[in-house]
Amino acid sequence: MRPWPIILAACVACSSATALAREQAIDVPAGTVPESAIAMARQTGTSIVVSDPVLTKRRTPRIHGRMSAPQAIRRLAESAGARAVATGTASWRIEPRPRPRRAASVRRSKPPDPGRGAVQPPPPSAVPPTPIVVVASKRDTSLEDLAAQISLIDGEDLALGGMGGTEKITQRVATVSSTYLGSGRNKLFIRGIADSSFTGPTQATVGQYLGDMRLSYNAPDPDLRLSDLERVEVLEGPQGTLYGAGSLGGIIRLVPNAPELDSQFMRGTLGNALTQHGAASVDANAIANVSLVPGKAALRMVLDAASEGGYIDKPLLDRDDVNRTRTLAGRAIMHAAIAPDWTLDVIGLAQSIHAADSQYAARKGPDYDSLARVREGADADYLHGQFVVSGRIGALYMRSTTGAAKQEVQERYDATMPGDEDRVFVQLNDTRMIAHETRIWVPIEDRRFGWLAGLSLVDNSARLNRRLEQGRKRSSATGAHNSLTEGTIYGEASYRLRDGLIATLGARYTRARLGGAAEDVSLALAVAGTAITETRDQSAFLPSGSLVAKLARGTSIYVRYQEGFRPGGLAIEGEFVRRFRQDHARTLEIGARHGRAGIDPFDLAVNVAYTRWSDIQADFIDNLGLPSTDNIGDGRVWTFSASGSVFLTDDLRLSGGATINRSTIDEPTRFFSHRISHVPNIAEFSGRMGLDYSRSVGRDLDLDARAWASYIGKSRLGVGPELGDLQGDYVDSGMLVRIGNERIGGTLSVTNLAGTKGNRFALGTPFAVLREQVTPLRPRTIRLGVDFSF
């Protein structure tokens, strides 16, 4: 046997190893693990494989500096909470660490097992903690550099126990609250910034986003299914500089999982539930990823379907469990690498919700009985599409998003007057929006200076039509059509004053043209058409400033000033249409945070905020019993919030959160001077606690258990004595157990463990405010489910 081939191979291997060990300039932008691995492989001349679906949706920060290829790959793996395994001289595999749910705990107690040729990571002192990149910052800011109160919910946590909507967010974040008219019809509030109980011409106080595009402008929460998400980010407000109008309370951003360019898989869940004093429920979910062009393009699709059994009875109609709700939703994302460092995403989403009847009951009647003599209910349909181009040129990043949304909500309310024939009030809210945003930025990361500049355009049209149905009679009630065209430029710049101290200044200028007209007006008003049609221009300048200081690794404090606004519009009162003014919020806050939730042994975030809210827009009940809108005065809101968690053992984590709100309307308008004293719909105190337990129970089985309880304090329904009923003051609870592995698992969950009736919302129909209505919690529900992947 000749030795030359062996000697030649050894020389090549030594040469390759020497080249890999040589330090070189590395600059890999922030992105998902597969995106970062591709960029890393190009720059280091190595082969890097990321095949585990658990890792493909994780995000990594920018990796920048001079280092060898092995050092760079180890750093990439560490930032993803994974490990690098050398499979050859210049080839690597990035895989999850054993028992990833307890990775932080294991690292605290002992070094990881290097088995199967794993490359040992550098000592802890040489590798900084994995930074968490906040997508909602719009410029890839790490959590420790962000001067804001933010809550992050992992998508895998949301997926446990079957599909769900916004209620899964309110259960996990104490500062987020909601009305409870029904799925697809609710209003959301953050940080005690609440205006009213109804959805009318006023813009929402919370901005909701799917990726970079807003879900709606002045429509209710569409209650999208939270399936196949990387995570949800709740950024407390105001967020006027970055997000503009309609972010007084903050924003909720849904970050979907990106398609995986080199993977083919399908996952799904099936579930069946039984509700005490109610009908059975069923739900199903399917997720599919298809690689269209390996390494270049992929398609990811999600389908959700559910039928939730009712639990409200209407004895006057001799019907039980009337409020069954059916939901059908689908989402598709096509992701393509169109050039080095440039990608294209096309996203489409559709959802339809049908509520067969209302979900409120009589306060003093049997537990779940409604005294309505008519069939109510609602339909909520939502369509959404967006087109996203993103990339980078050197250190400069760019992202451009264009899209459209359509939301249609039809509601039926019992409008029967005492001693009169049965009557139904029907309201149709049809909203259409076209939006565009382009921004460029240089992330601060380890630089001295970072900045962001952007522009956005919004065109929104909202048509509100109403009618009364009494027997075969149909009579139209006055409606309104509001339109808005808005142009905005904004910017933000951060400067590192010294190591661990970053100052940020920002501003946004918005110019909007508002239009409005009455719909279905009476003949007398139609003759005077100039009195019911109006167009005007408004502008707003929203400055912001913040300072964040790192006291130690993982510990920082910050102070921030921010503003927000909502444009005015036209409101209906009786048979007349009138104008209401824009409102404006100014907030000063101070906060501190330590650690990374669910990763570090201990984490804590606290925040105190003071808000001055001028010309508050709110809804009230007019003389005809219909919802109307007006400016109710000026107010002040104090908010204190805290959240944290601690690992009691390697397997057991305790978490909790609480919020305290104090509000006053200190300069009410003349009409409301004797009717209001504080902001409605916000409890003075709310809090939650949870326990998470995870461990291996066999060679290929993991056990995950969750238990939680939350308390929602008392709040007032709305503005005026007609809406003065109290609500809240109840405890909700639940638990979930899953046993299985990544391929298949079974779940058992129970909601409303204590069987609490409670009162989530003291209104079901605005025409029967004297009936003392309540909206009870769904009775105790037990669900069995199975999830699978192949």
Question: Predicted segments — roles?
Answer:
Residues 132, 285, 388-393, 397-416, ...:
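Membrane-embedded beta-barrel scaffold of Gram-negative outer-membrane proteins
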Residues 710-718, 738-790:
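C-terminal beta-signal and adjacent terminal beta-strands/loops
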